[in-house]
Amino acid sequence: MKNILDLTKEELQQEVTPKFRANQIYQWIYQKGAKDFESMSNLPKSMREELKEKFTITPPKILNVEVSKDGSKKYLLGLQDGHTVESVLLPMKKEERDEKGNILKEARYTVCVSSQVGCKVGCEFCLTAKGGFVRNLTPGEIVEQVLTIREDNNIPANRRVNIVYMGMGEPLDNLENVAKAVKIFSDEHGMSISPRRQTISTSGLAPKIKKLGEMNLGVLLAISLHAVDDELRQKLMPINKAYNIESVIQAVKEFPIDQRKRVMFEYLMIKNLNDDLKAAKKLVKLLHGIKAKVNLIYFNPYPGSPFQRPEPKDVEAFQKYLLDHGVLCTIRESKGLDISAACGQLKEKSHGCTL
């Protein structure tokens, strides 16, 4: 049987008649959290029986959760075939109430989702790569990560969250399923998470960046850059052999994006490797003419890693150079340092592996 969460609403409309029933089913699953068809009380009994015969609603199992002092939560989720993926809940702003208990400002969250079991790209600094590639996630398996985390944290269905495709896997290597997940998330009868609240991160698959742009999904784009010259980037990210920095930058320049938004460039700061002002100067030159935002990320060490976390003073100096030269730059607040929050850490930890 099919997992009904794999279907966009348009696909579901081909399965049920009349078509408006697809809207109701979406509302039951994505707004009311229904886990079975019998509870969908405004559907005819005959339709509920038919749905039970054709489809399943199969949420993943929560195998492990680690909670950080900063409120971040790292989830290890078990899929139906026994494989596991990781997802992370990142609280961005706390809820504020007045003395009467009325909500002044709603809490804001970002959910980091995985797109594959394992990864083909093989970045040297990423623990997920050590386990190799197993398979792509289905659209439903991507969507289920957010549903599961939302339910586990009692996040109201009408609370908008941001989604970043930055977990395990290379999203553009699973582009068709990721694109379907974007549509499912953004459907008005579902979670109504605007594409502008969804960021797809890529290691730099230049042709797929172009294809993503042609799909006109309206999502935000993030590029995992991490180096400013091909020699170093190739050592850190073998994908650079196929798609060098120049080809990635050209693909970014051609990518359609809302005029109010910017392309994010993620730059992992590694001590004594890419964290000096010489690299900052090259980065400014590289991004000339691009409406970009650079996100500096502290390397999150894992057992056996050959890399080290950079000094805060070096990261701050790097940021200052970029800002002084007209490049918008932020330092990502490190979250989950006490909970194995780097990709792949919780999975390896749960399996008792030492790397």
From Swiss-Prot:
Record text on cofactor binding: Binds 1 [4Fe-4S] cluster. The cluster is coordinated with 3 cysteines and an exchangeable S-adenosyl-L-methionine.
One Pfam family from the UniProt entry?
A: RlmN_N
Q: Which UniProt keywords apply?
A: 4Fe-4S, Cytoplasm, Disulfide bond, Iron, Iron-sulfur, Metal-binding, Methyltransferase, rRNA processing, S-adenosyl-L-methionine, Transferase, tRNA processing
InterPro entries recorded: Aldolase_TIM, Elp3/MiaA/NifB-like_rSAM, Methyltransferase_A, RlmN_N, RNA_MTrfase_RlmN, rRNA_lsu_MTrfase_RlmN/Cfr, rSAM
User: What EC number(s) does this enzyme carry?
Assistant: 2.1.1.192
Compartment(s): Cytoplasm
Radical SAM core domain segment(s): 105-338
Query: Biological process GO annotation list?
Result: rRNA base methylation; tRNA methylation
User: What GO terms fall under cellular component here?
Assistant: cytoplasm
- Needs which cofactor? [4Fe-4S] cluster
The disulfides recorded in the entry are C112-C343
Q: Which domain of life is it from?
A: Bacteria
Active-site positions on this chain:
E86, C343
rRNA processing listed as a keyword: yes
Residues at which [4Fe-4S] cluster binds: C119, C123, C126
Per UniProt, S-adenosyl-L-methionine binds at: G169, E170, S201, S224, L225, H226, N300
One GO MF annotation is: tRNA (adenine(37)-C2)-methyltransferase activity
Catalytic activity reads:
adenosine(2503) in 23S rRNA + 2 reduced [2Fe-2S]-[ferredoxin] + 2 S-adenosyl-L-methionine = 2-methyladenosine(2503) in 23S rRNA + 5'-deoxyadenosine + L-methionine + 2 oxidized [2Fe-2S]-[ferredoxin] + S-adenosyl-L-homocysteine; adenosine(37) in tRNA + 2 reduced [2Fe-2S]-[ferredoxin] + 2 S-adenosyl-L-methionine = 2-methyladenosine(37) in tRNA + 5'-deoxyadenosine + L-methionine + 2 oxidized [2Fe-2S]-[ferredoxin] + S-adenosyl-L-homocysteine
PROSITE patterns in alphabetical order: RADICAL_SAM
Report if keyword Transmembrane is assigned: no
Give the record's family classification. Answer: Belongs to the radical SAM superfamily. RlmN family.
HAMAP family from the UniProt entry: RNA_methyltr_RlmN
Protein name stated in the entry:
Dual-specificity RNA methyltransferase RlmN
Instruction: State the organism named in the record.
Output: Nitratiruptor sp. (strain SB155-2)
